[in-house]
């Protein structure tokens, strides 16, 4: 495998080489999140995952050519994984945890390991290999939400005086009653007390 990419000055991040024979191809956020959570709950080793789609794949600059995963040009990367204790029950996520009542009203809280949520560059500084979660929270008036939404694709909604941004390895938060939680786009249900932390380099992916 040939080393390439750098996350910090003077430090290599990633290697080149095809997806191994025992690797698993996961096509979207839901498949990846379920695989990680099932392995963690079953105390099983995580397989190497090939990514032809999803928010983590988009953040890493992957291509839509799934055949690339079998070539020497494919990139191997060690990725951080998030875990969240939700009212006493543990879950895992790879791209993002989002807590909200609505995108249009009330408090919005998110912990991002990946920059993208769909077409939105929601957390433009988030990097899934830097050991930190980008935690963004705020409760903007409707007019400001409309303006911010128009900038989400480009990531220029930040910085914003009404949004708080923190970069942390772990944190705890208490949500307002009636707030729902999504992990990698999958609904978990209503949540009140969250304890979030990052597991550095817990996942081996190929793009």
Please tell me what each predicted stretch does.
Residues 79-81, 132, 178-180:
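Exposed beta-strand and adjacent loop surfaces of beta-rich binding modules
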Residues 87-96, 125-130, 154-164:
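Short low-complexity stretches enriched in small and charged residues
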Residues 68, 98-103, 113-115, 127-132, ...:
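Short, low-complexity, polar/charged sequence segments that are solvent-exposed and flexible
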Residues 1-116, 122, 167:
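Catalytic core of DAGKc-family lipid kinases
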Residues 137-207:
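ATP/nucleoside-binding phosphotransfer catalytic cores, i.e., glycine-rich phosphate-binding loops
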Residues 103-148:
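Internal helical hairpin/lid segments
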Residues 76-78, 103, 127-130, 165-167, ...:
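A short, structural micro-pattern
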Residues 90, 97-98, 111, 135, ...:
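A hydrophobic alpha-helix/topogenic segment detector
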């Amino acid at each position: 495998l040939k080393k390439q990419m750098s996350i910090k000055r003077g430090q290599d991040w990633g290697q080149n080489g095809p997806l191994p024979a025992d690797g698993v191809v996961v096509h979207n956020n839901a498949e990846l999140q379920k695989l990680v959570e099932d392995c963690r709950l079953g105390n099983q080793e995580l397989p190497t995952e090939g990514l032809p789609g999803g928010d983590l794949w988009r953040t890493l600059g992957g291509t839509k050519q799934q055949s690339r995963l079998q070539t020497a040009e494919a990139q191997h990367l060690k990725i951080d994984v998030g875990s969240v204790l939700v009212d006493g029950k543990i879950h895992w996520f790879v791209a993002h945890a989002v807590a909200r009542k609505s995108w249009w009203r009330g408090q919005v809280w998110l912990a991002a390991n990946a920059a993208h949520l769909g077409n939105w560059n929601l957390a433009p500084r988030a990097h899934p290999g830097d050991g930190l979660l980008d935690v963004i929270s705020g409760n903007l008036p409707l007019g400001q939400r409309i303006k911010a939404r128009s900038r989400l694709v480009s990531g220029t909604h930040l910085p914003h005086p009404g949004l708080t941004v923190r970069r942390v390895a772990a944190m705890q938060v208490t949500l307002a009653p009636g707030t729902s939680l999504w992990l990698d786009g999958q609904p978990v249900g209503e949540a009140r007390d969250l304890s979030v932390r990052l597991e550095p380099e817990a996942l081996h992916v190929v793009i």
